[in-house]
Amino acid sequence: MENKKYYEELRILKGIAIILVVLGHSFSFTGFNILDNNILNRYIHDSIYSFHMPLFFMIAGFLTNNYEDNLNKKFYFSKIKRLLIPYIFINIVDAIPRHLFNSLVNNKSNSIERIIFYSGAATWFVYTLFLLFLIFPIIEKYIIKKDKYYLFGLGLFLLNIFEIGSNIKIFTVDRLVYMSFYFYIGYLLKNYYEKISGSVKKFNVIYIVIIILFILYGNFYNEFILSKIIFPFLGIISFWYISLKIKKVENLIYNFLTFCEENSLSFYLLEVFCGTVYRVILIKIIPIEYNFLLVLSFFSLKLISLVIGIKYMVCKNKYFSFLLGAKYKK
């Protein structure tokens, strides 16, 4: 990653975020509602969903170069290679078991129309991020760099407040509008990042208060439209602060999280397949009444399988690593 030595904490943060994606998806069991009957399940699920995807887009915006570097063939080719090819590959592969075993999956079909216009079966993040990378360099050149960056940010905020585009599913416009706000915040923050990260010690108490607020209220993010926009920052700041602490000690946790970060796209793309297999097995072994144990087992099996599969199979094969966005290691 460019400027890696300055942003190790962001690598750690992204590693934490992809693990939270795996955990968040572990609450999904076709035909069973394991959230409303268990307070702990609901709390963990909603706390994770309050911020984990905005976090990914915020980091992506932070790491975006200026339009002089982005408005060229090399930039767009890199995004096709990094995002579009894995997106197409995984959705084509995904379509096969969905048609053969449609009773075992949460989403029943993955047609060509859905892949092109509606982000596939479970890959909206990759689809939306790719579209954002396509349009943002143009927005940056013709709007942001014309000293209208505050107006653009205000415009994104108002679009979300009034939920404009929230019902438009084609090209994931609903998610594009929402996630663009966090992408843009990340883009703006990079100019002030060193000053902010350098002042952490001085404001330790404030960060601890934010963590406490996230623990107490993060799961209420979806109560109001304003809380849906503001509350994600509680989780983002809390885990950023934790990442800064982990960064200071290069131990097994550090190494594990950075591995997850550099292969986060593979984790995201392959998690659905692991989920389909283990969901069917576990629901027959563990009674639904023990739903927290069910979630914990589901999460653990998926994470262990993903780590082993990605480390020893995907990363070792140049074709798999290319098609799944992993870091190839001979």
Describe the residue ranges of each PLM region.
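Alpha-helical transmembrane segments and their immediate juxtamembrane cytosolic regions
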Residues: 1-330
